[in-house]
């Protein structure tokens, strides 16, 4: 039963959370480069 519910949780997680983390890390990297 858990396996059938897993994609409905995993797809939004990868589609929304991962890009948000990537954007945030990229933003912080650019900010550090400008400051230093």
Curated annotation (Swiss-Prot):
Superkingdom as given in the UniProt entry: Eukaryota
Originating organism: Mesostigma viride (Green alga)
Primary location: plastid
The family this protein is said to belong to: Belongs to the PsaI family.
InterPro entries: PSI_PsaI, PSI_PsaI_sf
Residue intervals passing through the bilayer: 10-30
Location in or out of the cell: Plastid, Chloroplast thylakoid membrane
Membrane topology annotation: Single-pass membrane protein
Keywords: Chloroplast, Membrane, Photosynthesis, Photosystem I, Plastid, Thylakoid, Transmembrane, Transmembrane helix
Protein name: Photosystem I reaction center subunit VIII
A biological-process GO annotation: photosynthesis
UniProt entry tagged with the keyword Endoplasmic reticulum: no
GO-annotated cellular components: chloroplast thylakoid membrane; photosystem I
């Amino acid at each position: 039963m858990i396996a059938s519910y897993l994609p409905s949780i995993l797809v939004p997680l990868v589609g929304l959370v991962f890009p948000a983390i990537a954007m945030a890390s990229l933003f912080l990297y650019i900010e550090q480069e400008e400051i230093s």
